[in-house]
Amino acid sequence: MSVTFTPETFGWIMEVVPSRGYKLDVRPYQISLDDVVKTLQYLKHHHEKYYALYRLMIEGGLRLSHAVYVMKMFSPSEVVEIPEIYLETPRLVCFSDKGFCRYYVGVRESQKPCEWAYMSIETLELLKKFAGNNIDRRTVTRYAIRHGLLAPKYMRKVSWRLMVKVIPREVARFIQSRFGELKISEARYEDLLSEADNYYPKYLEKLRELVYSSHVSENSEQYTSSQ
């Protein structure tokens, strides 16, 4: 049996029956580099352990949970095998002449993986100082809020915005383990690892220029992100 509605009835139905709404989940926010600099400066002088975590996050694009994991489980001399390329390697690989290291994290059985943690030599020294510490990430976030600092979750976002200015996006995705956006074959993995090693010093240079510099007043650029 078919039912026919008059135009008047159809119009009434459209008015009184709620329609299903779809909303694009884009949450723009402003991140001031001044806030990044002030946060790092405050932590450097008041909480060096959290300062080390923040540096890990901004230098490698790590999530707080992964930065905490790296600090707790830091085993630089351990030898591991990278599944994609069947290569045995020390967890910690340093390029002293280029001023950086990468540490194999190898967190994979998660929706939020973390393959490598790239960091400067200076951050490595901080990491060594606090290695083995078990930190509650909620405590870090509460500390940041209490002292008016940039929340930890924003450091990865700042890292991404700065990194893609000087590094090809595919390589930046590899460094930050954004594998949901990047499909890697066995051969390509080794290529990306090599490219990441070549490009990463450019990112550290950009960080030193915009973030680690003491000239806070010059770093007022705003970054809008929906990552």
Language-model region placement:
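N-terminal DNA-binding recognition helix of tyrosine site-specific recombinases/integrases
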Residues: M1-V17, G61-S65
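Short, basic (Lys/Arg/His-rich) helix/loop patches that form interaction surfaces
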Residues: N133-K183
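Alpha-helix N-cap/helix-start motif at helix boundaries, enriched for small hydrophobics
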Residues: L53-Y54, S65-V70, A172
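Conserved tyrosine-mediated DNA breakage-rejoining catalytic core shared by Y-recombinases
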Residues: Y69-I121
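Catalytic-site neighborhood detector that most strongly recognizes the C-terminal catalytic loop/helix
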Residues: Q176-Y223
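Basic, Lys/Arg- and aromatic-enriched nucleic-acid-binding interface segment
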Residues: L33-L64, R156
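DNA breakage-rejoining catalytic core of tyrosine-based enzymes
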Residues: V17-K38, K98-G99, S110-E122, G132-I135
